[in-house]
From Swiss-Prot:
Its main location: cytoplasm. This is Nucleoid-associated protein YPO3121/y1061/YP_0808. It is found in: Cytoplasm, Nucleoid. Binds to DNA and alters its conformation. May be involved in regulation of gene expression, nucleoid organization and DNA protection. Pfam families: YbaB_DNA_bd. GO terms for cellular component: bacterial nucleoid; cytosol. Residues 90-110 are annotated as: Disordered. The keyword Secreted does not apply. NCBIfam families: DNA_YbaB_EbfC (TIGR00103).
Amino acid sequence: MFGKGGIGNLMKQAQQMQEKMQQMQEEVAKLEVTGESGAGLVKVTINGAHNCRRVEIDPSLLVEDDKEMLEDLIAAALNDAARRIDETQKEKMASVSNGMQLPPGFKMPF
């Protein structure tokens, strides 16, 4: 059922995967990614835990009549940053399982 090496080999692979996942999670937590909107007029930087670290707003947007547009741009930049962090996490997770013999249909926990 488990092929060469049996269940012992499977357990060894699981231990290796767990170690790699922990390392990857530590790396991702340290990452900072910047999302943008309005062609770079609004930038939001978040870390791997999706905590907002910085918001940058181009001074040209700081006019009273454009409050709603500015709010929309901030939300869009935050969503862009979150999408970028999620993509980075998926790429790193794919590298963790690369080369391991996982059962068909097995999905990573994230």
